[in-house]
Design a protein with these regions (language model features):
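Transmembrane alpha-helices and adjacent helix-loop boundaries
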Residues: 1-339
Length: 339
């Protein structure tokens, strides 16, 4: 006799739905933990500020991951768009009183135009030639920003006028508001990354990344795909640049356009896992944890530059032993949830 319908097992979720459920659960847990941090009595402003720094570099890693991880274009000069976001917001606020909420979109527009022009000149190059071309642009921007002293502050940089706790000026005496702003931006960028990976455009980007000739033969508009990904990534970087500027309250040419900054914003994606939505998030968390530990070790041991040494060693280990990043080291079942 057949079992009653009421006792029949529910049908299993399709693989795609289970993967989305895993991703949602993996996202909700850290989001809840971070959101509750300011409410915990044992969490001070130093810890919150460290988490904000992590969130900022996660967003920068997420932006770079679009062009380099998903699109396969190794831009080593992406700090240019961080600098554009920072300087545009700061100059408009200091000189004209335009709030960062509006200045941010001006930075996005300038980054869009600059990325289109820069991409048109460099994206027909491949591999190391493209990477070196982006480095050249970055180094040129360092010199340009030093030259216009009245506008950018020259080598000394640009410091924001401080208005205290002000939503209009996007400023606060405590880091907690930046924690929530950074968390929201990380979630938005995660959603954008997931959408790109699942879209036809994302598949075209990955096809170009894997084999440009084969992608072109399959009907993919290679150059259009590359420059679109480059522009989207640049705009995302500029928005993160506004958050960077408002949190740190100052910027200088090296911090904005320098090669060391450009490399640092790549580390979250490289350590976490290139081409995945979760990679920059995991990599950014690992980076800041290591940074805080090594800073403490540097103070205790009196060794300067310990954090740079640890970053270098970690990157070497990832390249040699885990080319897919931390995500690639996770068990197969967990990897489905963090792609």
């Amino acid at each position: 006799m057949d079992a009653p319908a009421a006792t029949a097992k529910a049908p299993a979720l399709p693989q795609a739905d289970r993967s989305q459920l895993h991703s949602l659960l993996f996202l909700l847990v850290p989001v809840a933990i971070v959101a509750l941090l300011p409410l915990l009595p044992f969490v001070n402003n130093y810890i919150i500020a460290a988490v904000v720094r992590a969130l900022i570099f996660i967003t920068l890693g997420q932006a770079w991951n679009v062009v380099a991880g998903i699109g396969g274009q190794l831009s080593l000069g992406h700090g240019v768009f961080l600098g554009i976001g920072c300087y545009t917001t700061g100059i408009l606020f200091n000189k004209y009183g335009i709030p960062p909420w509006i200045g941010m979109w001006a930075g996005v527009l300038i980054s869009l135009v600059f990325a289109f022009v820069m991409g048109a000149m460099t994206l027909r190059m491949r591999g190391v030639f493209f990477a070196l071309a982006t480095v050249a642009v970055s180094l040129a921007m360092v010199q340009i920003s030093r030259h216009f002293v009245d506008l950018t502050g020259g080598a000394d940089g640009l410091a924001l006028k401080f208005f205290g706790d002000s939503l209009w000026a996007m400023q606060s005496r405590t880091p907690a508001p930046f924690l929530y702003a950074g968390l929201v931006l990380v979630i938005i960028y995660y959603a954008i990354s997931r959408w790109i990976l699942a879209s036809t455009f994302g598949l075209e980007m990955q096809a170009v990344r894997d084999d440009e000739v084969a992608a072109a033969a399959a009907g993919v508009a290679v150059f259009k795909t590359k420059i679109t990904g480059f522009v989207v990534s640049a705009m995302m970087t500029a928005i993160a640049g506004t958050l960077y500027m408002q949190f740190y309250m100052a910027i200088d040419p090296e911090a904005a356009f320098g090669l060391s900054q450009a490399i640092q914003l790549q580390l979250p994606a490289l350590m976490g896992g290139l081409g995945t939505a979760w990679g920059p998030i995991i990599g950014g968390a690992v980076m800041i944890f290591l940074s805080e530990v090594t800073n403490w070790g540097s103070t205790k041991l009196g060794i300067e530059g310990l954090d740079i040494l640890v970053y270098g060693l970690m990157l070497l280990v990832v390249v040699l032993r885990a080319p897919k990043g931390v995500v690639g080291l996770l068990p197969k079942a967990m990897q489905r949830g963090v792609r």
